[in-house]
Amino acid sequence: MLDSRRVFVLAAGAILFYQLILPPVVGLADNGDFAKVIGRFNLRGRVHKTYGYIDNVYTIRPENHWVSGFVSTEIPLAQLAVWLNRLISKDGNFDLRCIGVVHGALFLFAVWLFVPLLAGVDRGVRWAMCALALFMYCDMMYVNSLNSFYMDEPSYLFLLLTVVEFLRVIQFGRRLDAVLLMICPFLAVASKTQHALLGFWIALLLVATAGVLKPIRRSGWYTTAICLVLTSVLMIWKAQPADYASYPLYNVTFEEILPHSQNAVRTMADLGLDDSYRTCIGKKAFLAGSGMDDRGFRERFIERLSYGKLAVFYAKHPAAAFHTMIDSLSDQGRQHAFGNFDISAGYPPAESKAFALWSDVKSHVFYHHGLAFLLAFLSLVTLFAVLLLVEHKSLPRGVLTAGFCLIGAGFTELGLSTLCDSMDLPRHALLFFALFDMIALACVYLALSSGLRKTKWRTAAAVPARATITAP
């Protein structure tokens, strides 16, 4: 009999090895953010073609040194990659595949932990769920960023581990799983300020289900939840330079909200901006002429407009929020539009097409169709909620609460990725994509389990009936 766990992990490992290790190596091009992580390790891409190409090789030189002021769990992961590189590097340069190995190992660890959760279900359902998870999460949209230094990556990987460990604690009640469940949320939340809000949902889940999370006592989970909330607050408050939030605020304000406003002067006033900012409309924060290269301008702008004020603006102007969300989702309905190959591969700036079927399907349905994307998400969430309520008696205690926290996290990432910035939208939506696919996967599992259980019940009920008819 085939061992589904070994087959699944080996299949996932083979896909990662083919994509991340074998030439031509696939990754996700730097948009300028890598230095926030790797500058402290004296690394810089040898060619460094922003957006268009990845760098397989990074030079290690003192003049590359820069400490960015950002806090992220990607930094210790990069340190592990640097140590690994020291063991295998022949020329003293850094090989990008080392970070791919570190990220890939975490992904495969999540896969290894996931499969036993299906041990008690029907064999056909188990293999179907493994195949579907492989199809979704080994897609190029997720795999290419494993060979990168983006700070979203640990949030994605440790979120997967958090979800898997929660289900393992519910199902198996092992101490090691409980300890990992206490650790992984912190590593996910501490990856990037944008994703720190997820800590509140996870903390709520730990408090609400503390009674069923064995063998750790309730007080341990309450303490973990409190510490997780404090970590989330610290990440929002101190994990990046004080004026860095002005950049995404600038982008969404002047590139998305104001260009679509029918009365720009009134909209600027509602946002707390005066007419002097009219010249910024249509500009990107990181490009010349935006004014953002002037620290004084940034400080004045952030004094006038904050995320809190933006949230109030959206609440007062739901039509603007809706239009911004739809416009953003229209751009998000595809994999990252960055180059995936090193320039030495001889390709023009291009995206890999291998193992990209799931991305292609979503791109065909959702790209430039933001309303369809939003309706699909709302429909999926509604279906998931209905299935949870219908099936809750057959589910382990705590799963119903976890399901609704998952929905809440999905809406949180939807809002963060669509309403708070207007640049690199598919990359910023990585966790929203992951949660979208997670909810879809859960819907398939609940539907298959329910259908199989009803089929068995009908079969069992039919057997005595036939026996009664044919009895002498």
Q: What are the functions of these language-model segments?
A:
Residues 96, 131-156:
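Aromatic- and kink-enriched transmembrane "portal" helix at the membrane-lumen/periplasm boundary
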Residues 36-66, 239-348:
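Membrane-proximal stem/loop segments at transmembrane-domain junctions that anchor or position
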Residues 91-106, 324-406:
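Membrane-interface anchor segments at the N-terminal boundary of transmembrane helices
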Residues 101-123, 161:
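Transmembrane-helix motifs of polytopic, lipid-linked glycan transferases
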Residues 55-97:
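Short hydrophobic/aromatic helix or loop-helix immediately within or flanking a transmembrane segment
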Residues 178-193, 228:
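Membrane-interface alpha helices of multi-pass inner-membrane proteins
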Residues 2-55, 62, 227-239:
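Transmembrane signal-anchor helices characteristic of membrane glycosylation enzymes that use polyprenol
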